[in-house]
């Protein structure tokens, strides 16, 4: 009886034989792709996939069949909102022996191939999405074998993923209703990008609160931005240029609210004496601006932690159903809002 042949991991030489190039060319194509032609690079990458070669040290633990690596896809790494979510993810991952890689979707076109390579060569065990979009076209055949995925912060039902987030509609409703209770009836909204689901829900909360309070929704009182300081500043100026500018403004993010606050001051307005402003997220800067910003506090660290725990359950073979896991949020009253006299 013949002994069963022991399986061995594919080597760079196997890739070279399959691609009909030298091992030096394989090394350059995989480690320094700019040093070879696109055709050679494609041939080597195809051969690597076919023979199952995984470059070291990012290769998988053969014995345990895992890389102990998680990929976190962030819409914009420069947005301070994501720092605490990432921290919650990293601390939880480290406690379970996992390394976290960060992928920045703000430069998606340049990074898309990198994300795909990590997935198709099985160099990551799971993915956490902090936005509503996959950083690649999942319809392409070679990308169908995706690792376990969990979404945090956003909610996109079409992706059918387990999701950890707050009730954005109710949070926005409560913020706008608070402004109404302070006597404000001309309430503006600085909204985020229309294509983002969370912005849709926050805008719905704004609209529903106005209607509940018997206030007609005026489209002129809604200005849009892209979650940057500059966008908040520009949107605030748009609202201030109206014949009857708002006496209070609800912003979809703290970053835009801080930009709006700065612009209001540049125009000679006093906050909150002349204008009340509410943000969303409770990033650290909101406590130290002048005046400190009233905002919706999200449990960002806990969102990251819970999302990572769900992903760990998935990777360990447990069934994790799709749909929302809602976290609590809170309206934090600070110095940027006041009751009208």
From Swiss-Prot:
This protein's GO CC annotations: cytosol
Q: Which residues bind DNA?
A: 12-31
Q: Which domain of life is it from?
A: Bacteria
Tell me the ranges covered by the HTH lacI-type domain, including all copies: 10-64
For molecular function, the Gene Ontology terms on record are: DNA binding; DNA-binding transcription factor activity; transcription cis-regulatory region binding
What are its GO biological-process terms?
negative regulation of DNA-templated transcription; regulation of DNA-templated transcription
Keywords on record: DNA-binding, Repressor, Transcription, Transcription regulation
Looking up CDD domains in the UniProt record yields:
HTH_LacI (cd01392), PBP1_LacI-like (cd06284)
What's one Pfam family here?
Peripla_BP_3
NCBIfam families tied to this protein: PRK11041.1 (NF008269)
**PANTHER family tied to this protein:** HTH-TYPE TRANSCRIPTIONAL REPRESSOR CYTR, LACI-RELATED TRANSCRIPTIONAL REPRESSOR
What exactly does this protein do?
This protein negatively controls the transcription initiation of genes such as deoCABD, udp, and cdd encoding catabolizing enzymes and nupC, nupG, and tsx encoding transporting and pore-forming proteins. Binds cytidine and adenosine as effectors.
Instruction: Tell me what this protein is called.
Output: HTH-type transcriptional repressor CytR
């Amino acid at each position: 009886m013949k002994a069963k042949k022991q399986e061995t991991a594919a080597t760079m030489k196997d890739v070279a034989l399959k691609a009909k190039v030298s091992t030096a060319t394989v090394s350059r194509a995989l480690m320094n792709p700019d040093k070879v032609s696109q055709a050679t690079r494609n041939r080597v990458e195809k051969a690597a996939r076919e023979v199952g070669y995984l470059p070291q040290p990012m290769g998988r633990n053969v014995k345990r069949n895992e890389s102990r690596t998680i990929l976190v896809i962030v819409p914009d790494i420069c947005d301070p909102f994501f720092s605490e979510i990432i921290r919650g993810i990293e601390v939880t991952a480290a406690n379970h022996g996992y390394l976290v890689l960060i992928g920045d979707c703000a430069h998606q076109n340049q990074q898309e191939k990198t994300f795909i390579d990590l997935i198709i060569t099985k160099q990551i065990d799971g993915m956490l999405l902090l936005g509503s979009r996959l950083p690649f076209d999942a319809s392409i055949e070679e990308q169908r074998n995706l690792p376990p995925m969990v979404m945090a912060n956003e909610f996109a039902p079409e992706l059918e993923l387990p999701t950890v987030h707050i009730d954005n509609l109710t949070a926005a409703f409560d913020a706008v209703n608070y402004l109404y209770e302070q006597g404000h009836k001309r309430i503006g909204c600085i909204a985020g990008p229309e294509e983002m689901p969370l912005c849709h829900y926050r805008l719905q909360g704004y609209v529903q609160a106005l209607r509940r309070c018997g206030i007609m929704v005026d489209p002129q009182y809604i200005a849009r931005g892209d979650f940057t300081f500059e966008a908040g500043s520009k949107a605030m100026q748009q609202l201030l240029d109206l014949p009857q500018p708002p006496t209070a403004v609800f912003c979809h993010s703290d970053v835009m609210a801080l930009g709006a606050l700065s612009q209001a001051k540049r125009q000679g307005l006093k906050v909150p004496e002349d204008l009340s402003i509410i943000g969303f997220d409770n990033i650290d800067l909101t406590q130290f601006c002048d005046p400190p910003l009233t905002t919706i506090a999200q449990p960002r660290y806990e969102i990251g932690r819970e999302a990572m725990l769900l992903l760990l359950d998935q990777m360990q073979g447990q069934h994790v159903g799709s749909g929302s896991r809602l976290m609590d949020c809170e309206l934090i009253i600070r110095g940027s809002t006041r009751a009208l006299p």
